[in-house]
Amino acid sequence: MEQFHGTTIVSVRRGDKVALGGDGQVTLGNIVMKGGARKVRRIYNNQVLVGFAGGTADAFSLLDRFEAKLEKHQGNLTRAAVELAKDWRTDRMLRRLEAMLITADATTTLVITGNGDVLDPEEGICAIGSGGAYAQAAARALAENTELSPREIVEKSLEIAGDMCIYTNHNRIIETIE
């Protein structure tokens, strides 16, 4: 059976502001199954943003586990991410999950990879998913050459990725913490 795949999630941090956004397309093979999926959410009393890419069921499973880790560690984003990554590497069932997460709070942005790695992005910019490289390149160029806000950079980056990646559409959901 084919896997659901394809999306773009991008995050930009500037100063004390962070934006995290994603498109809404869910693709199965060469068919668009849904155009308005919500892949970016606020969790932990609206203090943490999370976006996910990869297999839909896998992503939701990881999201649930990540929320539980946040609760256990009183909202400490880094600790929750590291603990999730440890579980991901040691649990046989989790190792089979094909998904990635970007998480952000008021001070920290992290990428949690399918290998169980936790990455702190350079220059406060990161992206995942099939259109991630397009969005990240656009975000870096915009951040280096404009005074746009993180939200504006995320919006424009997703627009560019949607123009270039067949698995990314223009239905965007963007969340911010300021």
UniProtKB/Swiss-Prot annotation:
Any coiled-coil regions, as ranges: none
Xref: InterPro entries: ATP-dep_Prtase_HsIV_su (IPR022281), Ntn_hydrolases_N (IPR029055), Proteasome_sua/b (IPR001353), Proteasome_suB-type (IPR023333)
Catalytic EC class: hydrolase
One Gene Ontology CC term in the entry: proteasome core complex
EC number: 3.4.25.2
GO terms under biological process: proteolysis involved in protein catabolic process
Tree of life domain: Bacteria
Binding site for Na(+): 162, 165, 168
Disulfide bonds: none
Inhibition and activation profile: Allosterically activated by HslU binding.
Catalyzed reactions per annotation: ATP-dependent cleavage of peptide bonds with broad specificity
A Pfam family reported for this protein in Swiss-Prot or TrEMBL: Proteasome
Active-site residues, as the UniProt record annotates them: 7
Keyword annotations: Allosteric enzyme, Cytoplasm, Hydrolase, Metal-binding, Protease, Sodium, Threonine protease
Location in or out of the cell: Cytoplasm
Gene Ontology molecular function: any one: threonine-type endopeptidase activity
SUPFAM superfamilies: N-terminal nucleophile aminohydrolases (Ntn hydrolases)
Family of this protein: Belongs to the peptidase T1B family. HslV subfamily.
NCBIfam families, per database record: ATP_dep_HslV, PRK05456.1
Subunit and interaction comment: A double ring-shaped homohexamer of HslV is capped on each side by a ring-shaped HslU homohexamer. The assembly of the HslU/HslV complex is dependent on binding of ATP.
Function noted in UniProt: Protease subunit of a proteasome-like degradation complex believed to be a general protein degrading machinery.
Protein name as it appears in the record: ATP-dependent protease subunit HslV
Species of provenance: Burkholderia lata (strain ATCC 17760 / DSM 23089 / LMG 22485 / NCIMB 9086 / R18194 / 383)
Lineage: Bacteria, Pseudomonadati, Pseudomonadota, Betaproteobacteria, Burkholderiales
